[in-house]
Regions:
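Hydrophobic helical h-region of N-terminal Sec-dependent signal peptides
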Residues: 12-18
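C-terminal motif of bacterial Sec signal peptides marking the signal peptidase cleavage site
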Residues: 20-23
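Bacterial N-terminal signal peptides that target proteins for export
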Residues: 2-12
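Compositionally biased intrinsically disordered regions enriched in Thr/Gly
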Residues: 25-246
Length: 247
């Protein structure tokens, strides 16, 4: 797998600093905004168990065992982001529902598993990267399904940075084409045509550049997710931002 050459990348600081200023704003306002001194917190995350009414909930169609872990960062907006994500994904785990009698035949599996773990991966100036690792096993299934989502925060502006904010307007398809060329051998080996490849909304900043992550089975019927790096891609042509050094 190829990766982007360091000389072709926008520094991480630069990308994150200007993300919040995307749009039609006067240059003068942009200059004064970047000149402002912003206190960037140092993230120190502690893994904690999420408090839910019960670890195992039984309904008529079976029981589900929950294992939920998050992080405490002393940044309320970050901590709330992950809790709210879990509440949306697993509403039954947070609802104080009384157990019901399971109506599944005794000779059939009735216990499902669901786990979500949040982990802090690292910080580079105003960029903080986390990972949400999920695993679900439906009762009676041949195997469970796992997924890892990377979450990137701009600490100076207190916001989650999505791919739609990261990629310049009208450049999504051109970036897709460049990604395909950079990873063409692997993609062709798995019979994946250019029009089937999309710029993933799951990404992280690697040592040498941005890496787009594709979950299980999205690109091919295989047990490993695929990491699609942009090689020989001039990222400044696609990614929002201008270089700015930390002072």
């Amino acid at each position: 797998m190829k990766i982007v050459k360091r000389s072709q990348l926008i520094p991480l600081i630069s990308i994150l600093t200007v993300i919040a200023m995307v749009g039609c704003q006067p240059k003068k306002e942009q200059s004064s905004a970047t000149a402002e001194k912003v206190d960037i917190p140092l993230i120190q995350a502690k893994v904690v168990a999420v408090k839910i009414p019960k670890q195992k909930l039984c309904l008529e169609d079976g029981c589900t065992s929950y294992d939920l872990q998050t992080v405490e960062t002393k940044q309320k907006w970050i901590d709330e982001y992950f809790i709210n994500r879990m509440k949306k994904a697993e509403p039954n785990a947070f609802a104080n529902i009384a157990d019901q009698k399971v109506k599944v035949p005794a000779d059939e599996p009735s216990l499902s598993e669901s786990s979500t773990y949040v982990r802090f991966l690292g910080q580079n100036y105003n960029l903080a990267t986390f990972a949400i690792q999920t695993y679900s096993y439906p009762a009676g299934a041949a195997h469970g399904m796992s997924h890892q989502e990377f979450v990137n925060f701009d600490l100076s502006n207190k916001k989650h940075i999505t791919v739609s904010e990261l990629v310049k307007p009208d450049m999504n398809q051109k970036l897709r084409d460049e990604l395909y060329v950079s990873n063409q051998n692997w993609l062709e080996d798995h019979n994946i045509k250019k029009e089937q490849l999309q710029v993933s909304d799951n990404y992280y900043y690697g040592v040498n550049g941005i890496v787009f992550v594709y979950p299980l089975y999205e690109l091919a019927s295989m047990e490993l997710s695929y990491y699609c790096s942009s090689a020989d891609v001039e990222e400044s042509a696609f990614i929002v931002g201008q270089p700015r050094s930390e002072e």
